[in-house]
Amino acid sequence: MEPSNQIFFYLRRSKLLSGLGEIRMAKGQPLGTMERCYDMLTWGECVPDNCAFSCALKRHGKGGCIKAYDNRPACVCYYTCLRS
């Protein structure tokens, strides 16, 4: 499976299992558990074929919360957070 397909599969899976402690995504409006997400991704980390969604997922293994933004039309993600 190509890396991009793995990412989309993971996003689909995490959306289905978000109530079971998986990663949850929000666009624009942070959830209550995301208020203290300060770790920022830099522009260089979000390259054209690896936009903020996949970039944030790869970095999430470090724990905590990640705030990410990429202004390209297909690459808009503001917050990711691991729910406890």
UniProtKB/Swiss-Prot annotation:
GO terms for cellular component: extracellular region. GO terms for biological process: defense response to fungus; killing of cells of another organism. Residues 1-28 form the signal peptide. Disulfide bonds join C37-C81, C46-C65, C51-C75, C55-C77. InterPro entries: DEFL. Keywords: Antimicrobial, Disulfide bond, Fungicide, Plant defense, Secreted, Signal. Its main location: secreted. PANTHER family: DEFENSIN-LIKE PROTEIN 122-RELATED, DEFENSIN-LIKE PROTEIN 184-RELATED. Belongs to the DEFL family. This is Putative defensin-like protein 139.
